[in-house]
């Protein structure tokens, strides 16, 4: 493969059977036939080919095509999900806001309030929202996604002992610009998932996330902060180049989003 993946996402075969080839093309020799419901882990991919991935099956390595011949129907299901991205809106004055979400590498699953070709809300400076569809009140817009196929960048980040997770998140989220309330809601959601692990390899994603989960907001915000954490649990610590994080300055109409995903490995 052009790029080897150390912490690749898990997937299961959903086609009746899936051929594994010795190269990323059907002209190569078939190395194995993988039955339906088999659990696999992505080990690598080609930079210029989104249809083939490199996997291991029963000690053999090879390539599988993750789409049928129509290039739309998938042969596998990815188990990684985008968990609880929430969107806060802070206009300078009462404002009608339209928010659209475009997912190119995952499938929209649950939304609240209900997403109907976007969200239409009246937003207030304190962050409170009124959903125009039914008049319900909210603190944020919630969404999550399944079958996430995004290849997140795990080359830089932080290896953190599970027992140090709370301290780490408080420090980094404050530095990146979350308010105490936003930070507390982030930590309350993620801490129970992470602190019992021996270690966590933690990254905060940039373009890999923002380009695959695009936000279109009308009116356009003056400042936008999108924090998306991706982590994987480890039994032992690893050395990794520390990630340089950016700070965030709030000005004018401000939008803040946070969420995350765990790369689970069998």
Q: For each predicted feature, which ranges?
A:
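Short alpha-helix capping/helix-loop boundary micro-motifs
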Residues: 24-29
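Protease-labile, long low-complexity intrinsically disordered regions enriched in Pro/Ser/Thr
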Residues: 77-266
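SH3/SH3-like beta-barrel superfamily modules
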Residues: 1, 32-69
